[in-house]
Amino acid sequence: MSTVKQRTRTEGKPQYPLMQSIKDTLKLKTTKRTNSEKKVSTLNDKSGSPIKSNSERRNGITRKVNGSKRLSAQRVALFKYNNVQVFNYVRNGNNSRKSSMSSLNSSGTVVMCNEYDSEVTNLKPQMLIGKGVLELYQIKTPAALDRKEQTMNYISLGRGGQIVHPILPKLKITKLRNENFKYLITFSNPERYWQIEFLQINGQLHDELLKITDEFESIISSVCIFIDENITKLASLKSNKTPPNNVNTLDQIKEKVQTATENDDDEAEELDYLLEDPIEQEPTSSFEYDVPTDLTEVFQRTMGRINSNGSRRYSSVPQFSHRRSMIRRSMSLFPEHEGRFS
């Protein structure tokens, strides 16, 4: 009875032949192969090239995004100095806020020092925000041929870039007057001020630091608004001076030349009159007894000068007129001798 039950159990189970088991084994291998190919295909993009990891992308490896080919952003160092200190400045009151805001809104133009003085003098240091390394760098993002390359400039303070701020084209950096190594950065929205001071490194010469600040100024002036208060103050002083009127000056010169010519003509006419009216020399024996001795000497000395210099032109006509009038007034006192000195 037990043997019959055991036989029925074995007959109820499905029996797999040898060929069927071989087919199942082959199917299992093919499914594993197709799964591995699918995994490899997921690591490739549409063009068949493998997709790179994040580290490869950071190193500037090319890739395709939305069908457009582009390169990763690149960092270009512009300037670096290892010893600066930066203070944050705030306004010392609200009296000059309107005048200062007008100068801030006029970004893109050079602000003269007389407008900028109130902005500087009404600031006070609040706190030290950084000391150490100052760096200027540029981030370039290349694009496809049909797009323009994008660039952005930044200023970094401290080691490792503890404080980073973008440098926009309208940012204003001012070199303070009578200060070779101090600069004021004016931020807007919100309104803030940084004063950067370049400090000497041990053993560094003054001229060497000047060369470094000159390099800093040349780079800053190419990426934003740079103002040198020493130069703008000199320009404002020159502009305040009234320029000479060339037309009036020329007219004055012509008038002086014409007046001098007329005076020369008058001198010539009067000298000719003197030469045409010669004074006769007569014996002065009787005159010497009638006229006082001192007055006679004056007459003789005066007449001698006139006779000796009558042949040349005097540069001063009033001198002749004065002497003639003096002689005539003197001779009016002696009517009997007036004809001799007329």
UniProtKB/Swiss-Prot annotation:
Q: What is its main location?
A: membrane
The record's subcellular locations are: Peroxisome membrane
- Superkingdom, taxonomy of origin: Eukaryota
Tell me one GO biological process term: peroxisome inheritance
Spans annotated as Disordered: 1-60
Q: Which Pfam families match?
A: Inp1 (PF12634)
Q: How does it sit in the membrane?
A: Peripheral membrane protein
Signal peptide boundaries: none
GO CC, one annotated term:
extrinsic component of intraperoxisomal membrane
Q: Which InterPro entries match?
A: Inp1
Q: What are the entry keywords?
A: Membrane, Peroxisome
Stretches with biased composition (Polar residues): 41-53
The record lists its disulfide bonds as none
- Biological function: Required for peroxisome inheritance.
Q: What family does the database annotate?
A: Belongs to the INP1 family.
> How is this protein named in the record?
Inheritance of peroxisomes protein 1
Q: Which gene encodes it?
A: INP1
